[in-house]
A protein has these predicted regions:
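Histidine-centered active-site microenvironments of extracellular/periplasmic hydrolases
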Residues: 376-409
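Active-site lining segments that contact anionic ligands and/or coordinate catalytic metals
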Residues: 323-325, 367-369, 375, 392-395, ...
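Metal-dependent active-site segment of extracytoplasmic phospho-/sulfohydrolases and closely related
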Residues: 360-386
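Feature for exported/extracytoplasmic and membrane-associated proteins, marking the mature portion
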Residues: 1-352, 356-363, 383, 399, ...
């Protein structure tokens, strides 16, 4: 069933006229900008399937208690800065060294990290340790938004541009997801989707959002298709009285629709709504055809999202796609206090969900063709503010998949310090790897032509390399035939 073009024409007409609602109901620019559709640029789609899955950890994950120094010397520095949990003044947030023994990541013999540091994962992440040991997971050290390479001296002098509004949740979420300032209308996942549209029979299913609204999947042409753990999310803006997240816009639309059957807006809306229902039925029928044996457990919001992503990948043949970008998320990571315990539990959810998803890709025969990576607003201070940590900048993240050169570290390990040249105060890491370098490396694997990388990663020309090296060379992917 080909349904990738018709709804776009109706979407354009409907949203063009919904400019009336912007004046009457203050509909968001994000929603209205979905109208700007264009032809996809040339893309190296190859002959098989590939997908990228972004796991966004909202709130700013505390990387210091996610990937922890384990060797004696660096652990001692870490514990001295963070304080021992359970100390008399209750100011400690350092994890106990003995609790890390089962999650130590062995540094490859041909790698030497800064100060000979050895890392361990949080105790609640044993499954990611197993993936690292098997070569399916790689940590990317001290990555964050940068406009250009930046040293501490340049930061202090203000001689090199830096991202705007550092340490701010909304601004840095947008900057991470778009490689542009807060207010950007496209994200780098959506811009990859723009390039990949021509590879898919049904272009609507190129970018799929299994969580709330985010700029990451919005392109100039690509429009995020919304799903929930239960399947397709039907478009019915009047059901809850909030069109484009605006009650006034919803009321304005209701008034227009009641104005008579000859109203052109009403006709557009009716056609658009009918198409949305067709899409929902089509997606849900495709999902019902899927048999997935991998267990994702219960009571894990992230696992629920990744389960439906796995089901959609299993249905890729019926959906008519060979390239897809997905977004899932988990919130609750803004630990200004109560870090010990709460943070461990959240990391346990990430560990369980990402592992289950990887095992599902193995079951489906696409482990080499699906790459999952974590992201977050920012890292956090290495120093404790009592029983938590404050907003930072650079952080450590994970890349998972059969196409990953796992079992080794990428990027540059920072010193365990609050006054070294690779931090900007209180142990806030100054990134040594940019988000643009991360997105460019993923983009090359995904099929983005080198000449098109600046459209995905706008700052990449300022950095030494567009390929950090954590992905294996592109190979013929598994064909999307099932």
């Amino acid at each position: 069933m080909f349904i990738g073009k018709g709804i776009e024409i109706e979407r354009r007409a409907f949203l063009r006229r919904s400019g009336q609602l912007a004046m009457m109901g203050a509909a968001s620019s994000y929603a209205l900008d979905l109208a700007g559709l264009a032809e996809a640029a040339a893309f190296n789609g190859g002959g098989g399937y590939k997908a990228l899955v972004c796991v966004f950890l909202y709130g700013g994950n505390d990387h210091g208690n996610t990937l922890i120094p384990f060797d004696q010397a660096n652990y001692a520095r870490y514990a001295a800065i963070r304080g021992t949990a359970g100390s008399e003044d209750a100011s400690g947030i350092a994890l106990g060294r003995s609790a890390l023994a089962n999650t130590v990541l062995a540094t490859p013999s041909d790698q030497r990290l800064t100060d000979d540091i050895t890392y361990a994962l949080a105790p609640t992440m044993p499954r990611l340790k197993t993936l690292f040991d098997s070569g399916a997971m790689a940590p990317l050290l001290n990555v964050g938004p940068l406009i250009a390479p930046l040293t501490r001296a340049q930061y202090d002098a203000g001689s090199v541009p830096r991202p705007a509004k550092l340490f701010s949740h909304n601004d840095q979420q947008s900057t991470w997801q778009s490689s542009q300032p807060e207010g950007s209308r496209t994200g780098w996942g959506g811009r990859m989707g723009d390039l990949a549209l021509s590879s898919n029979t049904n272009a609507m299913f190129t970018a799929i959002n299994a969580t709330g609204n985010a700029v990451f999947l919005s392109g100039q042409t690509a429009v995020p298709y919304q799903v929930s753990p239960a399947g397709a999310t039907l478009y019915n803006p009047l059901q809850n009285g909030r069109l484009f997240n605006s009650a006034a816009a919803s009321q304005a639309l209701s008034t227009l629709l009641r104005s008579g059957s000859g109203n052109v807006m009403a006709a557009d809306y009716a056609r658009f709504n009918d198409r949305s229902i067709q899409y929902g039925a089509f997606v849900n029928d495709a999902l019902r055809s899927v048999t997935l044996c991998t267990s994702f457990g219960t009571g894990n919001r992230l696992a629920d999202q990744l389960r439906v992503v796995a089901q959609l990948i299993a249905a890729r043949g019926r959906l008519g796609v060979t390239r897809q970008v997905f977004l899932v998320s988990l919130g609750g990571f803004d630990h200004h206090d109560g870090l010990i315990g709460s943070h461990d539990a959240l990391l346990g959810q990430v560990d369980s969900a990402v592992d289950a998803f990887y095992r599902a890709t193995v079951e489906l025969g696409v482990a080499d063709n699906v790459t999952t990576f974590t992201a977050s607003d920012f890292g956090r201070t290495l120093s404790s503010n009592g029983d938590g940590s404050d907003h930072g900048w650079g952080a450590h993240h994970f890349i998972v998949g059969g196409g990953v050169r796992g079992g080794r570290f990428y990027g540059r390990a920072p010193q365990v310090s609050v006054n070294s040249a690779d931090q900007v105060g209180q142990g806030r890491l100054l990134p040594t790897t940019s988000v643009d370098e991360l997105s460019a490396t993923l983009g090359l694997w995904f099929g983005v032509a080198p000449s098109e990388l600046p459209s995905v990663a706008p700052n990449i020309g300022r950095f030494a390399s567009a390929d950090i090296g954590f992905m294996k060379p592109a190979q013929t992917a598994v064909a999307a035939t099932r």
